[in-house]
Amino acid sequence: SLVQFEKMIKEETGKNAVPFYAFYGCYCGWGGRGRPKDATDRCCIVHDCCYEKLVKCNTKWDFYRYSLRSGYFQCGKGTWCEQQICECDRVAAECLRRSLSTYRYGKMIYPDSRCREPSETC
């Protein structure tokens, strides 16, 4: 669920998902278009694409179990959808951590008008 993804982001990056990622670049937050602006934005388009593959799952609201062991997230047992959603969120949260060095506060609330390039496909 988005609540768990938000928690993973905080645990991985030390930043709250809102406001630091909810409106970042062209792809973080709801929807997206154009080209990703940097590594952080690329994490978000990859996450969007991961969710797109789970067409029969309720990606935003399905609750899943996970734990943090030795600094790594482990997705718990659950339905196929719950496990896949957890994996999408886990990979994205870890990607956001790896991208912290290139995070730019100037892209934190990025105007849609700057996302006009042709959109990337999954």
From Swiss-Prot:
Residue pairs linked by disulfide bridges in the UniProt entry: C26-C115, C28-C44, C43-C95, C49-C122, C50-C88, C57-C81, C75-C86
Pfam families the record matches: Phospholip_A2_1 (PF00068)
Binding of Ca(2+) occurs at Y27, G29, G31, D48
Q: Where can this protein be found?
A: Secreted
The free-text cofactor remark is: Binds 1 Ca(2+) ion.
Q: Does the keyword Signal apply?
A: no
Q: In which tissues is it expressed?
A: Expressed by the venom gland.
Catalysed reactions listed for this entry: a 1,2-diacyl-sn-glycero-3-phosphocholine + H2O = a 1-acyl-sn-glycero-3-phosphocholine + a fatty acid + H(+)
EC number of the protein: 3.1.1.4
Return the similarity comment: Belongs to the phospholipase A2 family. Group II subfamily. D49 sub-subfamily.
Q: What is this protein called?
A: Basic phospholipase A2 Cdr-13
- Give the organism the record lists: Crotalus durissus ruruima (South American rattlesnake)
Taxonomic lineage from the root: Eukaryota, Metazoa, Chordata, Craniata, Vertebrata
